[in-house]
């Protein structure tokens, strides 16, 4: 068996959580391979909404194994809050969830450092969520991090050394903070973490593959936030692309199967950074309100704009996408005209490749216009019900992108999902 990968192709918030939940019945194992609690995956079903920040989105499908991989950074305190909220809703996840011993821990001082670093940038802020993600990955790369497996042996000494190093940095930055309110509940959450099965996830996942079990790898954020290939420096601190699945779970590239790329029928971005198709007018505001475009973790309002096919083709190339999934089609139900950016104009020249640097002043999107469908799609159950104009939009996108759109989402609920090209 091979590992199928599901990841975002834009600037995050594409709807990965919902799709993982929909696809999970076809898999034995769901494994999260990177990121931390800075982004939430939202799922809606049976009249309830759930937001997962660290726990894989396959947790709601009974009997499925869910793994937090080594590429994830884990905040024990936020993890406990998340797990206890699920337990209060009737989901005891201790039998289903395993956690890699090699996943790195977000310390209380990581969160303070994150906030201090952002404050020091002044007007040059990149829009971090302040959850400690960047400093945790910094410690990981500099070989100073604490891992989940460390809590089993001599943890207090390792923690004290890391804390002392962080406090020296904070003193040098002249940043005030109060550790007392953060440290006690964090250590209590560490004890809670020990209730879960802590594993050598790379061995376990490869054993599942040898046994013929099917595995779905779940990514967080989106390709355009990748530390290497995103719109740097306005990016996250991990590899959000398909290659991150190999390093974040410990699997061979030869074991990667289908790559599902998720995108919205339009574009959004939260925080700072370039966004060529951003709409700062009534159209963008309508997209925001109709799409409920507010961060599931931070509550921040997302910037909205038309779909960007230059960026989308770039993301598909890097990830080797074999199947596309289009989300939030229903948000565009009310528009008379739908626009799609097919090229950029930079310095008077037409550009089809996503460039090294994109800025608002240098990059002008060139659009193709298509007629809107002006039809409520939220109650549709089959692609046979799609209006002609929507089918034309799908055909246009498939021709431009060269990959079939296998799934179309027409609403936030699990049931508002239409599978195309059934095999």
Give each language-model segment a name.
Residues 1-423:
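Non-transmembrane, aqueous-exposed alpha-helical and coiled segments at domain scale
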């Amino acid at each position: 068996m091979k590992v199928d990968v599901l990841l975002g192709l834009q600037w995050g918030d594409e709807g990965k959580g919902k799709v993982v939940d929909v696809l999970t019945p076809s898999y034995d194992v769901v494994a999260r391979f990177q990121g931390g609690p800075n982004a939430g995956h939202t799922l809606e079903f049976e009249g309830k909404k759930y937001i997962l920040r660290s726990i894989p989105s396959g947790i709601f499908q009974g009997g499925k194994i869910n793994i937090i991989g080594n590429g994830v950074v884990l905040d024990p305190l936020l993890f406990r809050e998340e797990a206890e909220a699920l337990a209060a809703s009737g989901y005891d996840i201790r039998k289903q969830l395993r956690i890699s011993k090699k996943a790195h821990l977000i310390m209380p001082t990581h969160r303070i450092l994150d906030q201090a670093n952002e404050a020091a940038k002044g007007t040059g802020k990149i829009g971090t969520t302040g959850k400690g993600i960047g400093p945790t990955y910094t410690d990981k790369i500099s070989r100073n991090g604490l891992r989940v497996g460390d809590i089993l042996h001599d943890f207090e000494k390792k923690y004290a050394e890391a804390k002392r190093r962080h406090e020296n940095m904070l003193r040098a930055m002249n940043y005030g903070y109060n550790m007392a309110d953060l440290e006690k509940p964090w250590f209590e959450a560490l004890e809670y973490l020990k209730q879960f099965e802590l594993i050598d996830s790379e061995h376990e996942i490869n054993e599942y593959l040898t046994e013929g079990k099917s595995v779905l790898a779940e990514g967080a954020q989106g390709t355009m936030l990748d530390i290497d290939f995103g719109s740097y420096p306005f990016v996250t601190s991990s590899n959000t692309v398909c290659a991150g699945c190999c390093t974040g779970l410990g699997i061979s590239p030869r074991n990667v199967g289908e790559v599902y790329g998720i995108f919205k029928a339009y574009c959004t971005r939260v925080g700072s950074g370039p966004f060529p198709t951003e709409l700062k007018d009534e159209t963008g505001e309508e997209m925001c309100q109709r799409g409920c475009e507010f961060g599931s973790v931070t509550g921040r309002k997302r910037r909205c704009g038309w779909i960007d096919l230059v960026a989308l083709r770039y993301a598909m190339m890097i990830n080797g996408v074999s199947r596309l999934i289009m989300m939030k089609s229903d948000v565009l139900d009310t528009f008379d005209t739908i626009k799609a950016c097919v090229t950029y104009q930079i310095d008077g020249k037409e550009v089809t490749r996503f460039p090294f640097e994109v800025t608002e002043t240098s990059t002008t999107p060139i659009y193709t216009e298509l007629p809107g469908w002006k039809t409520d799609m939220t109650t549709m159950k089959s692609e046979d019900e799609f209006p002609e104009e929507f089918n034309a939009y799908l055909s246009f996108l498939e021709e431009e992108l060269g990959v079939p759109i296998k799934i179309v989402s027409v609403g936030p609920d699990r049931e508002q999902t239409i599978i195309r090209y059934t095999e």
